[in-house]
UniProtKB/Swiss-Prot annotation:
GO terms for biological process: one-carbon metabolic process; tetrahydrobiopterin biosynthetic process; tetrahydrofolate biosynthetic process. Disulfide bonds: none annotated. The gene is folE. Belongs to the GTP cyclohydrolase I family. It holds the Pfam family GTP_cyclohydroI. Its EC number is 3.5.4.16. It catalyses: GTP + H2O = 7,8-dihydroneopterin 3'-triphosphate + formate + H(+). This is GTP cyclohydrolase 1. The keyword Transcription does not apply. InterPro entries: GTP-CH-I_C/QueF, GTP-CH-I_N, GTP_CycHdrlase_I, GTP_CycHdrlase_I_CS, GTP_CycHdrlase_I_dom.
Amino acid sequence: MSIISSEAQKVRQALIKKGIETPTIELTQDKDSRRAEIQQHMRSVLELLGLDLRDDSLEETPHRLAKMYVDEIFSGLDYATFPKITTIENRMKVSEMVLVDDITLTSTCEHHFVTIDGKVAVAYYPKKWVIGLSKINRVVQFFAQRPQVQERFTEQILTAFQTILETEDVAIYVKATHFCVKCRGIKDSNSYTVTSAFGGVFLDDRETRKEFLNLIHK
């Protein structure tokens, strides 16, 4: 049975309470069983497309897809993979904005299972706790590693950091290209989607919000 950290449990419960958790069902199979079953189904899908899986280039594709789905691009569906977060007491009394910009976003659109590619900015005003800067990137990556819609993703990482840091003073900005728009349908290769979410002082104070937006647009 997977062990889920207390931080992961708190974040998950906060998302459920707000109604912004990714729609999921309870998993009853272990990873090996899920990989094996996905591999079998992907073999059927590829054959229905007319691909010859006896070809050297294709014969391992069902296995590669199953492993990629479970262990990599959808690993964020399993809270046992939530990054280990150690909050540090804010003994230096840091009171200025902490901003991490240009965090790489690579996720998967839950409507068509194609790529979402973009950048994320995360800012917060420390109160009692601070966290290591790399942990911010890791939390963003965790929520990217699941089928997503950008609006929900933005709200999820806002709530996650508010929960971990025990402060409402968090701001999120996401700018991304959606390959469901770029490579199919309208096939618009130039457009991008921007979403943002603000809490606490970022929501209540226009000047604070303006400072954040000015910093990320420099």
